[in-house]
């Protein structure tokens, strides 16, 4: 029967259920599979049962939390999607004093509950509907990461359903202090190894968490593309100013650690380039210093900053003003915590350890302004450049599975559209832009670049093992051999056990 319940509150949603068309879709509408069922689970015990049934019946399974996987890793045919989005508990264990987050929590769930109940937070992402299940284990970051590091830098333990050598599904809890090397490998693999590799995460554990700011300063300003087209040198000046500021102010302990910015380099059709900045805390000076640095050398007679009117993808801005606003931190977080419409999309990423070289700035200009039959105008395409570094870079590259610990900027290439007929032109634009920036091998680590971000997964990458994980990949392979010997959990770019 449709909606045939397994054990309340979990239920099985099959193709004849009216919920099925919704539950087989995620954020990226390019990926729609046709699984035998979607198992909406309500607790860890149910997950063990579902995983065991899939193993016994030789059915492939995938896991969905918030549904924000950029590629089609979760969508599948003739298998089972384990939907953990109902596991949304967040709290503090009265016996251990540890904080916990269940894997179905969204970013907004964790911000809201941790702040209201305990006055703490996690340096997680700016999209409210992203699920903790995939976000944290991929090394999630956000607007407090320069201040507090990555989500995984606070992780102390993980509860996960694995399948052992005897093909038995079981719930295990491992921590940073687990007694065996194998258990420590499994814990470490969840500090940036990414989702869909080792098991079904049910809960994250944190011995301590950073205190949340009480307030924050926000500013959002824009520059008109019409001015930039007329004065190309000013575009290069803004881009260089941005890179140089963070090249000089991203070391651990920097007085600008509380400052985080998002530069939305939209395509020309969007009308504006938009900059959003947050400074956590009551001190406005770091924000003012940064904004002054951004417009250093900019001839305001030729180009003036204006109030933004453009929102791209899920990224919001503070509208209708060019002035900084002081507000309670949770309110500021909510103001920037957009999600946007579910559309078709494609994404790519790169870490940078230095400001933009001249050749890259030339490529950025070309691919943001190009409009022709092959690359038609799209106001929903952009290169987003996030600030990075500071507390993130205080951690050794092998202390977690995230090896990029010397970067100052994190780039996300994005394009959104609605109709399948538009797939080819959008994929061509983003793919050709990316190759113009880095060549066919992608952003291989060197003195300027440092690979790619596993949570912005990209099926086009050939040497993804090195671009995501660098020298940390062999230890991930070891954890795979130990904890998923039958490769139950796999996808196009999942960790391979190897020899």
Regions found by a protein language model. Give the residues of each.
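Cofactor-binding catalytic cores of oxidoreductases
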Residues: 10-26, 66, 71-73, 217-499
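FAD-binding subdomain of flavoenzyme oxidoreductases
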Residues: 124, 129-230
């Amino acid at each position: 029967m449709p909606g045939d319940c397994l054990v309340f509150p979990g239920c099985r949603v099959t193709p004849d259920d009216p919920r099925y068309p919704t539950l087989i879709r995620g954020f990226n509408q390019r990926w729609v599979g046709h699984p035998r069922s979607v198992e909406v689970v309500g607790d860890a015990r149910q997950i063990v049962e579902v995983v065991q049934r899939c193993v016994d019946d030789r059915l492939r399974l995938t896991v969905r939390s918030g549904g924000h996987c950029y590629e089609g890793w979760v969508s599948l045919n003739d298998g089972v999607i384990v939907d953990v989005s109902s596991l949304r508990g967040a709290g503090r264990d009265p016996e251990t004093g540890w904080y916990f987050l269940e894997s179905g929590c969204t970013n907004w769930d964790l911000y809201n509950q941790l702040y209201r109940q305990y006055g703490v937070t996690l340096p997680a992402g700016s999209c409210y509907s992203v699920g903790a299940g995939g976000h944290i284990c991929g090394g999630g970051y956000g607007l407090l990461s320069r201040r507090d590091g990555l989500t995984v830098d606070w992780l102390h333990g993980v509860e996960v359903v694995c399948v052992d050598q005897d093909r038995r599904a079981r719930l295990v809890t491992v921590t940073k202090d687990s007694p065996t090397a194998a258990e420590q490998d499994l814990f470490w693999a969840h500090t940036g190894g990414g989702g869909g590799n080792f098991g079904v995460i049910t809960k994250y554990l944190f011995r301590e968490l950073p205190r949340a700011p009480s307030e924050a300063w926000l500013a959002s300003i824009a520059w008109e593309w019409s001015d930039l087209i007329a004065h190309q040198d000013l575009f290069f000046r803004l881009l260089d100013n941005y890179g140089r500021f963070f090249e000089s102010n991203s070391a651990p302990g920097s007085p600008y650690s509380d400052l985080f910015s998002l530069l939305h380099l939209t395509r020309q059709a969007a009308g504006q380039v938009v900059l959003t900045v947050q400074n956590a805390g009551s001190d406005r000076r770091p924000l003012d210093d940064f904004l002054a640095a951004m417009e250093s050398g900019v001839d305001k007679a030729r180009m003036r900053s204006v109030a933004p009117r453009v929102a791209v993808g899920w990224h919001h801005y503070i509208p209708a003003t060019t002035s900084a606003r002081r507000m309670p931190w949770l309110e500021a977080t909510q103001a920037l915590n957009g999600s946007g419409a579910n559309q078709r999309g494609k994404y790519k990423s790169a870490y940078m350890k230095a400001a933009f070289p001249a050749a890259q700035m030339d490529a950025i200009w070309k691919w943001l302004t190009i409009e022709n039959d092959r690359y038609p105008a799209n106001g929903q395409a952009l290169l987003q450049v996030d600030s990075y570094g500071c507390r993130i870079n205080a951690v050794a590259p092998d202390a977690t599975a995230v090896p990029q610990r010397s970067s100052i900027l994190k780039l996300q290439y994005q394009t959104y559209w609605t109709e399948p007929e538009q797939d080819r032109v959008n994929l061509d634009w983003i793919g050709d832009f990316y190759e113009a920036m880095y060549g066919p091998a992608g952003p291989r680590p060197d003195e300027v670049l440092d690979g790619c971000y596993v949570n912005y997964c990209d099926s086009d990458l050939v040497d993804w093992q090195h671009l995501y994980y660098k020298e940390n990949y062999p230890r991930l392979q070891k954890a795979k051999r130990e904890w998923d010997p039958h490769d139950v959990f796999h996808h196009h770019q999942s960790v391979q056990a190897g020899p």
